[in-house]
């Protein structure tokens, strides 16, 4: 099987570029993969299936959706809400009619009228204020012959949107832990938060919880790593909460080795967001590999993490109180941290191993090419193999096999 691989690649500053750099060696060990150069309009001649990585950043993925529209293929859908991407490749290129057409196709006349309001600046940009209500995923789904997604949440959303072609849930691959010494930024418990600093990552709530926690446990330090979004006044918030003197350590962009060092030096990792665009988190997956206890929002992919590796915080009226209580538990109970750590590393090995992920990718691509005939052949082969080794239909082994098959919507 000859695969044309469309994706951002290093040195682009993109989580999906890092993802592809991790996945490609394992995928190439199993099938013939050609990485398509950035800006290419079509796959190379002789390609059996094209694989398009699509995220919500128009700068990184605009050329990829252009190629997808010319040559349909399998899509790795890294985000479900794609409004920012669609706006970038329509309005961002001066094509307001295309933007209005997509809105009307997905949301009827109401969508089109709101689109006029956005264009005339009478309505805030929908990709900033209402992205989940107007995801515009059909812009990509209509050209996809099959999907790879990373959560049941996204699979259910695309099914609800009417997508009826193959859709496989494939875990985000885990990076091997590099030989990098952990870097401690403070002497007490360090709570690490990695990613863009803005309101949708619940940074205001995290800062309030940190301030409340430090009133009882002043040895706790919050480490914030990542760029600050324009318009988010972090310094003013720190000052208002009394965190501008100490209690918070700030880092902007860091390279890969420093990222691992700071992750390794954190005792707890926090990754919050609301709303979710259906995305996963590379820093959370790295944290699993390192065995770090997690605190996440109870939304999307994050809600699907096992309870024994992640404390979950609902983005509701009790969010700050729940977050403060969870952080206090982890800051004061090393035994709880140790138990969650062991569970996290086991999960990373069991579910997120890059070779296992590559096998699931190949199965998904073959299914995209072969459709129902491949489904039937795989099910027949698995059923026969299970019977040969004496696995009964009601056994624990059979239930585990069924769970694995369900990940790629077989069985």
Name what the model sees in each region:
Residues 338, 345-350, 354-411:
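C-terminal amphipathic helix plus adjacent low-complexity
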Residues 234-257:
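Nucleotide-activated donor-binding/catalytic signature segment of Leloir-type glycosyltransferases, i.e.
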Residues 153, 173:
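Carbohydrate-associated surface elements
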Residues 184-201, 207-210, 223:
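Conserved donor-binding/catalytic core segment of Leloir-type glycosyltransferases
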Residues 100-146:
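Membrane-proximal helix-turn-helix segments that form the acceptor-binding/catalytic region
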